[in-house]
């Protein structure tokens, strides 16, 4: 089949009345889009669009490198990461770089190296972006047919999809190799309060790993967010990487089935909408993961989860009052329930008081005190270790609550500290970004479907107030 790259189609979108402004030689008349429509002007210019994407990647990687070095420059080893407003160093520490037992930072040089590598990479990407945006060929189809494409060429589109899937699969395997062979990763569950270790006994059982996908998202079930051991996380990445690579090969070798050709819209804007929907889902899942999961996001680096801080408070006061002579097994609280300990709906012994709602929390500082029926009274009396007391007291005062002005903790607490948890920032930002990506998906999906149906006209601007106003210039 002859490639269709010469068939230029411009959607008749009506835009602002000032169509004279031209950027990089592409104005509204020749492209059908005004300057503020950004990459829409490049829909049919694959070379220029490549430049825009490479330059965008350069900006992303530059931010990563610069922010990384900024965090290294401001890092104080004596304070926990989550007290310092860090969001990048906790990720590097979770990968096992620069940390030792208990999550203590013993070497910041790997963090410096990471920042420099990202800055160098961003320079390469930035040069490539400028080259392709300004100097390279406008279209790739004639000179480099392998990299050229036509949005309507379904076979080429699924080939590109396949290449992307293979790259994602290789990315998943990078984590696997780091955990298995290159120094290991940080395991918050390692005995005695967490340590870096190599993963030796991968979970590859499909019933276990795909069982997470079949769990309820509610309560103590928690869907995939409930994963709480590294063997499952790394084993899951083996499966994900394999599925992505095999799926990528399949998409490269095959053509779309007839039902897919009929059901999907095959245009650049449609692909944009699909991508935005996927990123939106990723954002919402990441939000839940960083908020609730203390295995993939260890509390040593990100601060405690909300339930963890609450349970830590109950534990701290249980320890204090038990030392003062209270019988924590039988003391009654103001509601008639147990003051320190009570029973869950399913019969386990749990912490009493307001924290009862978080009874299904699992945390490495607390699990050693559980028996077959929940919290074990004899262990609470005899086996509490100093590191558990220290950690729970620390977590109690660093709950992931807080306002934009950084006055953290409970709003009514007179001893509030100048602290906002990275969990708050990361969960909130990913929720907000996930929401806006979803709105972008709806917007572009609607436009793509309308264009495919043949009635895309843009917004009718005949009665727009701006038309009757004096131009600003």
UniProtKB/Swiss-Prot annotation:
The keyword Thylakoid applies. One of its GO terms (biological process) is photosynthetic electron transport in photosystem II. It is a multi-pass membrane protein. The modification Phosphothreonine is found at residue 15. It is found in: Plastid, Chloroplast thylakoid membrane. Keywords: Acetylation, Chlorophyll, Chloroplast, Chromophore, Manganese, Membrane, Metal-binding, Phosphoprotein, Photosynthesis, Photosystem II, Plastid, Thylakoid, Transmembrane, Transmembrane helix. One of its GO terms (molecular function) is chlorophyll binding. GO terms for cellular component: chloroplast thylakoid membrane; photosystem II. It comes from the Eukaryota. The modification N-acetylthreonine is found at residue 15. InterPro entries: PS_antenna-like, PS_II_antenna-like_sf, PSII_PsbC, PSII_PsbC_sf. Belongs to the PsbB/PsbC family. PsbC subfamily. One of the components of the core complex of photosystem II (PSII). It binds chlorophyll and helps catalyze the primary light-induced photochemical processes of PSII. PSII is a light-driven water:plastoquinone oxidoreductase, using light energy to abstract electrons from H(2)O, generating O(2) and a proton gradient subsequently used for ATP formation. This is Photosystem II CP43 reaction center protein. It comes from Oenothera argillicola (Appalachian evening primrose). The gene is psbC.
């Amino acid at each position: 089949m002859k490639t269709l790259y010469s068939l230029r189609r411009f959607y008749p979108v009506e835009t602002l009345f000032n169509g004279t402004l031209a950027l990089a030689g592409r104005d509204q008349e020749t492209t059908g889009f005004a300057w503020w429509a950004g990459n829409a002007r490049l829909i049919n210019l694959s070379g220029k669009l490549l430049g825009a994407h490479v330059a965008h990647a350069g900006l992303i990687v530059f931010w990563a490198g610069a922010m990384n070095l900024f965090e290294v420059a401001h890092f104080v080893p004596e304070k926990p990461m989550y007290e310092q407003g860090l969001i990048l160093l906790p990720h590097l520490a979770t990968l096992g770089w620069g940390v030792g037992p208990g999550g203590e930072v013993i070497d910041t040089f790997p963090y410096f190296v990471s920042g420099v590598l990202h800055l160098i990479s961003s320079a390469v990407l930035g040069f490539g972006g400028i080259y392709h945006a300004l100097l390279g060929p406008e279209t790739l189809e004639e000179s480099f047919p392998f990299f050229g494409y036509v949005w309507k060429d379904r076979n080429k589109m699924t080939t590109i999809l396949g290449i992307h899937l293979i790259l994602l699969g290789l990315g998943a395997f990078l984590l696997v190799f780091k955990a298995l062979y290159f120094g290991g990763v940080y395991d918050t569950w390692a005995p005695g309060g967490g340590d870096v270790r190599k993963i030796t006994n991968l979970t590859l059982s499909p019933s276990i790993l795909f069982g997470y996908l079949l769990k309820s998202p509610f309560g103590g079930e928690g869907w995939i967010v409930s994963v709480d051991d590294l063997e499952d996380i790394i084993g899951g990445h083996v499966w994900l990487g394999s599925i992505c690579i095999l799926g990528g090969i399949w998409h490269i070798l095959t053509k779309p089935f007839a039902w897919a050709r009929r059901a999907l819209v095959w245009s650049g804007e449609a692909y944009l909408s699909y991508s935005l929907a996927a990123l939106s889902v990723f954002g919402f899942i990441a939000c839940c993961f960083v908020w609730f999961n203390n295995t993939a996001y260890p509390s040593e680096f990100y601060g405690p989860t909300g339930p963890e801080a609450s349970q830590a408070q109950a534990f701290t006061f249980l320890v204090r009052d038990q030392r003062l002579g209270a019988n924590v097994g039988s003391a009654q609280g103001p509601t008639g329930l147990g003051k320190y300990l009570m029973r869950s709906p399913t019969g386990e012994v749990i912490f009493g008081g307001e924290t009862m709602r978080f009874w299904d929390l699992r945390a490495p500082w607390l699990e050693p005190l559980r028996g077959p029926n929940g919290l074990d009274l004899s262990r609470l009396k005899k086996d509490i270790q100093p590191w558990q007391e220290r950690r729970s007291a620390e977590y109690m005062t660093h709950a992931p609550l807080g306002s934009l002005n950084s006055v953290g903790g409970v709003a009514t607490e007179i001893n509030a500290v100048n602290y906002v948890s990275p969990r708050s920032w990361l969960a909130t930002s990913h929720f907000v970004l996930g929401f806006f990506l979803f709105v972008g998906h709806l917007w572009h999906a609607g436009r793509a479907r309308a264009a495919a149906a043949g009635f895309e006209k843009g917004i009718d601007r005949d009665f727009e107030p701006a038309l009757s106003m004096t131009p600003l210039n």
